[in-house]
Amino acid sequence: MKNILFIHQSAELYGSDKTLLLLLKNLDKNKFKPIVLLPFDGPLKEALENENIEVVIAPVLKLYRKLFTPKNLIGFFKDIKTAFKIVNELHKKYQFTLIYSNTLAVLLGIMFAWKNNIKHLWHVHEIIEKPSLFKKAFVGLLSLKSNTHIVYNSQATKVFWELNKSIINKGVVIWNGIEIYTPESSTSELFDIRKNLFLAQPN
């Protein structure tokens, strides 16, 4: 059994929220145990718990445009301390083999994975043209050795971010599936691919 920490920026049930829910519903629970970290309570938390998936509420270290004010930066650094304390306890209990960050907005996953030498998968839904500082920062984060896999929601997103060889070698496009519109065979094939990304090869 491989334990995976999933980190998401929201607890609503919109686009990326539904994508995460669909992925977790179809994950082979005989092989993988998902633990989900959300920033607050909401309908996504309830939907996940209805699938018997453990959900933990904690700061996810969300990056946003108004972060760079003295007040918000102080709050962000406090959240780092709180978030790391919670995830450290979870890691002691579950010994995660992979951390999955759903959207670029959450930084906790890559930060914790880098510090603790854990494999990290970033599911990228966004194209961020401006501010250019954010774009440069994310290119650097996506290039990190600890960020072992990148899943893009479209070819356009993949092309936008593949600015160096380090990023190119990690990426794959998997279209977001919406359960009600996707034939069963296609959904099964989609999640077979996704699950294969989680397989950690023995050293």
Feature-to-residue mapping (PLM):
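Short N-terminal targeting/anchoring amphipathic segment
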Residues: G75, V87-V106, L121
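A short helix/loop element that forms part of the nucleotide-sugar donor recognition site in Leloir-type
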Residues: P183-Q201
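A conserved, positively charged/aromatic
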Residues: K71, L121-V151, S166
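An aromatic- and histidine-rich active-site surface loop
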Residues: L98-N116, S132
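A short, glycine/small-residue-rich beta-strand->loop->alpha-helix junction that serves as a flexible
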Residues: I7-L21, E129
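Short amphipathic alpha-helix
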Residues: S16-D28, G42-A47, V139
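Carbohydrate-associated surface elements
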Residues: A156, G177
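Conserved nucleotide-sugar phosphate-binding/catalytic loop shared by glycosyltransferases and other
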Residues: N30-K71
